[in-house]
Curated annotation (Swiss-Prot):
Motif position, Nuclear localization signal and RNA-binding (RRE): 34-50
Oligomer status and interactors: Homomultimer; when bound to the RRE. Multimeric assembly is essential for activity and may involve XPO1. Binds to human KPNB1, XPO1, TNPO1, RANBP5 and IPO7. Interacts with the viral Integrase. Interacts with human KHDRBS1. Interacts with human NAP1; this interaction decreases Rev multimerization and stimulates its activity. Interacts with human DEAD-box helicases DDX3 and DDX24; these interactions may serve for viral RNA export to the cytoplasm and packaging, respectively.
Domain notes: The RNA-binding motif binds to the RRE, a 240 bp stem-and-loop structure present in incompletely spliced viral pre-mRNAs. This region also contains the NLS which mediates nuclear localization via KPNB1 binding and, when the N-terminal sequence is present, nucleolar targeting. These overlapping functions prevent Rev bound to RRE from undesirable return to the nucleus. When Rev binds the RRE, the NLS becomes masked while the NES remains accessible. The leucine-rich NES mediates binding to human XPO1.
Composition-biased stretches (Basic residues): 36-50
Region annotation Homomultimerization: where it falls in the sequence: 18-26
Start and end residues of each stretch annotated as Disordered: 24-50, 79-123
The protein, known as: Protein Rev
Sequence similarity: Belongs to the HIV-1 REV protein family.
Other remarks in the entry: HIV-1 lineages are divided in three main groups, M (for Major), O (for Outlier), and N (for New, or Non-M, Non-O). The vast majority of strains found worldwide belong to the group M. Group O seems to be endemic to and largely confined to Cameroon and neighboring countries in West Central Africa, where these viruses represent a small minority of HIV-1 strains. The group N is represented by a limited number of isolates from Cameroonian persons. The group M is further subdivided in 9 clades or subtypes (A to D, F to H, J and K).
GO molecular-function term, one example from the UniProt record: DNA-binding transcription factor activity
InterPro entries per UniProt: REV_protein (IPR000625)
Length: 123
């Protein structure tokens, strides 16, 4: 691993210099030429930028010894969640035991589903 030999700060600075050189090696395309030529140059430039971004992530993860992105936050299952739009702050449409409050950790469960559309027959 790159961060284990020598000074870790020096290795990180070296990785940052490499990444900076990569980005500087891909300047934005010139505005000359026809519309289609400019569009093609920008498309190829964006593809190179994506490649440089992925290479940079790999360099940093190798240098730091961990992924560059944080671990995603675990969310509760969506099946048990509902929106409580009551204005009075009550528990309209939910069943709760006496003395408990609904918060982020306790999803609200609807007792009966709301009617969104009618039966489809015109009266």
């Amino acid at each position: 691993m790159a961060g284990r030999s020598g000074d870790p700060d020096e290795e990180l600075l070296r990785a940052v210099r490499i990444i900076k050189t990569l980005y500087q090696s891909n300047p934005y395309p010139s505005p000359a030429g026809t519309r289609q030529a400019r569009k093609n140059r920008r498309r190829r430039w964006r593809a190179r930028q994506r490649q440089i971004h992925s290479i940079s992530e790999r360099i940093l993860s190798a240098c730091l010894g961990r992924p560059a992105e944080p671990v995603p936050f675990q969310l509760p299952p969506l099946e048990g969640l509902s929106l409580d739009c009551s204005k009075d702050g009550g528990t309209s449409g939910t069943q709760q035991p006496q003395g408990t409050e609904t918060g982020v950790g306790r999803p609200q469960v609807l007792v009966e589903p709301p009617v969104v559309l009618g039966s489809g027959t015109k009266e």
